[in-house]
Amino acid sequence: SKAKEFFINNIEIKEKLENDFNKENLINKGFQEAFTELITKLVQSKNLNEVKSDNLNQIKSMIETFTIEEEKFINKTYNLRIGVSFNKKKIFEYLSSKNVFPSEIKEEDFLFFPILLDQANNDILIYSNNSFYDNWNSVEDKNFLVNYILPTEDLEDLNLIRKNYSEIENYNFENIIKKYSLQNSIVAIFFKDEKEIKVLSKINIKNKKVIKSNSFNNINLQDEGELKKIIYDLKMIYEDFWKEQDIINTSI
């Protein structure tokens, strides 16, 4: 990424056309949104609160240019879409002053293979009745860098995994993964009992293998809100792991 600027576009802001309407204030609001979007993509979630800023002058000092991509009036509301370009060196200096290391902003495809072990019923669910398979891609955030490809239903794979139910934690999924020709994959095994869900994530990034373990208590998968929160939290864990692979040494 040799470019000297970070460009954030499609920032949409709107405001009612009242007597105190001020276009400049609206553009300033857009600058703040663009800055928040940029740093959310650049840093791991644990550092986000340290580097968020409401200081408009500080944000403006890091902006090179901005463009108005679209403006329109609908129902007495002024709608604005802007693109903002930030000076990369100044952004890096700002993060460095907070002792935070940015990562490359790199979008990437991952095969995501969710396996739900219903321990109460001694059942293994992959495609049907697996709420993680059904809902995984319905939880989105425009700042996510990882794009998930879910497996297509495959009876052969299902039988293979069922056959290895008892040692699923140690099972090597390579035969299944290689069918998809993707460099990166996550096999997530969800161990579900009455009150808790443990998640064992077998992550493979460019031949680097890592296992992560997380647990969620008092979860009801029938509750859409709770289910989506687990999915969002797991996606954040995977986002952070992806960012860890590409930390930029800004001192060079």
Feature names for model-found ranges:
Residues 60-70, 113-114, 147-153, 162-198:
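A short, hydrophobic beta-strand-centered structural micro-motif
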Residues 49-114, 125-129:
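Signal peptide-directed extracytoplasmic domains
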Residues 1-18:
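Short N-terminal segments immediately surrounding and downstream of signal-peptide cleavage
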Residues 5-10, 83, 87-90, 177-225:
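Amphipathic beta-strand/beta-sheet edge segments enriched in Tyr/Trp
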Residues 25-50, 113-166:
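N-terminal segment of the mature soluble domain
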Residues 24-41, 83-106, 141-145, 176, ...:
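C-terminal/domain-edge helix-coil "capping" segments
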